[in-house]
Amino acid sequence: ASSVMMRIKAVTRSLHSKITIDMKKNTGKPEPLFLNDANMCISTDLYQLTMVAGYFERGMDHKSTFELFVRNLPERRSYLIAAGLEQAIHYLKNLRFTAEYLKYLKDLPVFKNVSRELFDYLREFYFSGDVYAVPEGTVIFANEPIIRVTASMIEAQIIETYLLSMINYQTLIASKASRVVHAADGRGVIDFGTRRAHGPHAGLLAARACFIGGCVGTSNVLAAYELGIPPIGTVAHSW
């Protein structure tokens, strides 16, 4: 059976290429597609950057204040639990545009008529605004700001997508975990969601958010190692 498995070839497709990976010979170059401090600068929607280009070209870089909040609570939900702030702050403190990603952006057709000064600006970019936020684990309600950012228009626009993604997801998971914990009525609730998560990184963030929401442990070993959450597990059903 093992020799049969070793002959299996995995095929991945992208818009520009087809890579055949021979699992036995270890050829090809599969990409892990994980976020890191280098590539998170372009972990955003393109329209955020086209708006930044518009602001820059027109000199629209005055100080502005943006608030992240939930307009309406989901049906049969009376509250949410704020989560994701630590990762949002890490992003703001470490956000930089490296030469590799600036070249990629500069070569995009949508930026062909943009002045080169914009990319000089982005090369020196760092977040210099002010952030006000409720602590993680705080009960929040509709129309109540989770995070308030005061910064230049360009800075605030660049960070919108990442902050929304990070805060929305972890707040969603922490809120659900809190409801389950309350329903358990004093019995311990454990996060076993990694295998059902939308990818390994989502599983890691979910384990963190579950702990904020009141879970007593996680099956995710990486989350336990990185965050100090008690690791819990026995054996699978197949045992």
What residue ranges belong to the model's regions?
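Low-acidity, Ser/Thr- and Arg-rich intrinsically disordered low-complexity segments
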Residues: 2-3, 7-9, 13-17
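Ordered alpha/beta subdomains of enzyme catalytic regions
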Residues: 8, 19-239
